[in-house]
């Protein structure tokens, strides 16, 4: 599978997300747009006239599908919105093409609970968090419930921390 990146810097996120749909396969990321043979994922960002235009085409097994969306250039967190917009489109297209639906949605390369803690710190309600993570991040209901419960349990522990406390994160691969 080739991931073609055109006009944006989200190559790492696109590659990681693509790997979830093609486990064990070699994923090559390139800006060489001539490599649209065989299976590929083409992602493009064009900016102009106050709008960022995102476009994704997935060609898998001889069948192609595409999606696009627009984001105002002055949108809050424009870069993050582009990253997540690309992620949602890639997820939907590759899910339809492969029949896979990764339960953690578009979340790659980050501990999900870290995002949940940030949402709580920003004053979001549990309902707002649920909406964000199901609609924007495409988490499955089971993983969403697990993450919310984990965040609540972790917050109980963190609330007892003192100034001289520290956190130790141990990465345990589970792929």
Predicted segments with their positions:
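Conserved, mostly hydrophobic/aromatic
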Residues: 175
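N-terminal [4Fe-4S]-dependent radical SAM core
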Residues: 98-101, 121-168
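A short, structured N-terminal alpha-helical element that caps or precedes a catalytic domain
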Residues: 1-96, 100-103
